Regions:
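Short acidic-hydrophobic, aromatic-tinged amphipathic segments that line or gate anion-handling sites
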Residues: 2-9, 183-188, 308-313
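Short internal beta-strands
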Residues: 155-164, 268-275, 281, 352
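C-terminal core of ALDH-fold dehydrogenases
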Residues: 323-430
């Protein structure tokens, strides 16, 4: 189970464990299998999709079952408890309003010759969203991935999600209805990613694929990247906490367990300056564990990938966090804003005693699709920017052309590109 560590050597050994966990997709034994599945879908289209869906999800599956009709989606929405619908719609509204703040505006500048140079933003036309199904059916995944695409203005949003013996989770379909997804297909796994990337007779090729999934989905996204854009290769979920003597140990314990229950490789790490508070947190972790529904998962994730780390001061905790670049970071101290100013690497930051990470997972508004496995050093949370393209433009006047002509002619000649030089020179001679 979860333990407290404070020796430098123990901390470094723990970091080694986390680093090895981060490389799980690189060394996976399933790489060849996923590559074969993707090639099969590329070459055989719908036939391959049907065969794999029969093999993995539903032995009675037929091609006519692949698309979920608008009527079935609406029926699912109407079948869901009204209070659940209220919650889903409230979550949609909050997520939508937050992402509206990310919308970019075109801009331009003009130089002394009247030359105009600028940037324009256009939405990606077609996006595919992967939503896990079966036991790991997460309606929040629909909202968090679809809403920013809607805000960006994507014309076509296609959702794929695997069914269990032909049956889809009605709450997942209700979210698709609320978010106005254009097409829903009951397929999953690497074959679904390949279908979105390459297209089949039934499923149109998309320009970008987003959404989480298991190791097969992650490897498939890596396999098709280049034929299509992707969001990222998601690893196991993780949280780091920075706490001092003011922390509420009950809250901290609950938040560590909330993260650890995601899956067996999930990581929950608390950096804390008080040994006494660390022991209190551990006491509540053990107490709350007894009432958890997912004890098997918790046991493995707490044993393998989680620790309470006692540090000499807050600055040491900050150093460790910046090194790990966690997906989620909770700062539960007397001065959380001051500490956040020193954080360089984190996917999303939750400030203060009352900002539970679970609020962000569902209803707060910012996106819960975040960089994992240390990639917060160079990746960001999913947002509107992930669904738009930035193009530059330039309009040069006759005077502007003359001003640039000689220098560009000489620059191109320097590089040995004589036709570039001619193109510039001709305009300067008018």
């Amino acid at each position: 189970m979860l333990e407290i560590i404070e020796k430098e050597n123990d901390i470094e050994q723990f970091f080694d464990v986390l680093n090895k966990r981060s490389n799980m997709t690189k060394n996976s034994k399933f790489v060849e299998t996923v590559s074969q599945i993707c090639d099969d879908v590329l070459n055989n289209g719908d036939d391959a999709l049907v065969n794999y869906t029969k093999k993995f999800d539903d032995p009675n599956f037929e091609l006519k079952d692949i698309e979920v009709s608008k009527e079935e989606i609406k029926k699912a929405y109407l079948s869901v408890d009204k209070n659940i619908i209220r919650i889903l719609e409230e979550a949609y509204d909050r997520i939508y309003k937050f992402h509206l703040t990310q919308v970019r505006k075109d801009y331009s500048i003009k130089d002394e010759y009247g030359t105009i140079m600028g940037v324009r933003y256009t939405p990606i036309e077609s996006v595919g969203v992967y939503v896990p199904g079966g036991k790991a059916a997460y309606p929040s995944t629909v909202l968090m991935n679809v809403v920013p695409a809607k805000v960006a203005g994507c014309e076509n949003i296609t959702m794929v999600t695997p069914a269990t013996k032909g049956v889809l989770n009605p709450i997942v379909l209700a979210c698709a209805y609320i978010a106005k997804v254009d097409h829903v297909y009951r397929i999953g796994g690497a074959q679904a990613i390949a279908a979105l990337a390459y297209g089949t007779k039934t499923i149109k090729k998309v320009n970008k694929i987003v959404g989480p999934g298991n190791i097969f989905v992650a490897l498939a996204k890596r396999e098709v990247y280049g034929s299509v854009g992707i969001d990222s290769i998601a690893g196991p979920s993780e949280v780091c906490m920075i706490c001092d003597e003011t922390v509420n140990p009950k809250y901290a314990a609950a938040d560590l367990l909330a993260q650890a229950e995601h899956d067996e490789m999930a990581s929950a790490t608390c950096f804390i300056t008080s040994k006494e508070k660390a022991e209190e947190i551990l006491k509540y972790v053990n107490e709350f564990y007894n009432s958890a529904a997912r004890k098997d998962i918790l046991t493995k994730s707490l044993n393998n990938c989680s620790k309470i780390v006692v540090v000499k001061d807050i600055n040491k905790a900050i150093d460790y966090v910046n090194r790990l670049a966690p997906e989620h970071l909770e700062i539960d101290t007397k001065d959380p804003m001051d500490i956040m100013a020193k954080i360089k690497n984190a996917g999303s930051v939750f400030l203060g005693t009352y900002s539970a990470e679970s609020f962000g997972d569902y209803m707060m508004g910012p996106n819960h699709v975040l960089p994992t496995s240390g990639t917060a050093k160079y990746f960001s949370a999913l947002g509107v920017d992930d669904f738009i393209k930035r193009s530059t433009f330039q309009y040069t006047t006759k005077e502007g052309a003359k001003a640039l002509s000689n220098d560009v002619n000489d620059f191109a000649t320097l590089e040995g590109l004589t036709m570039h030089a001619l193109s510039a020179k001709l305009r300067g001679e008018e």
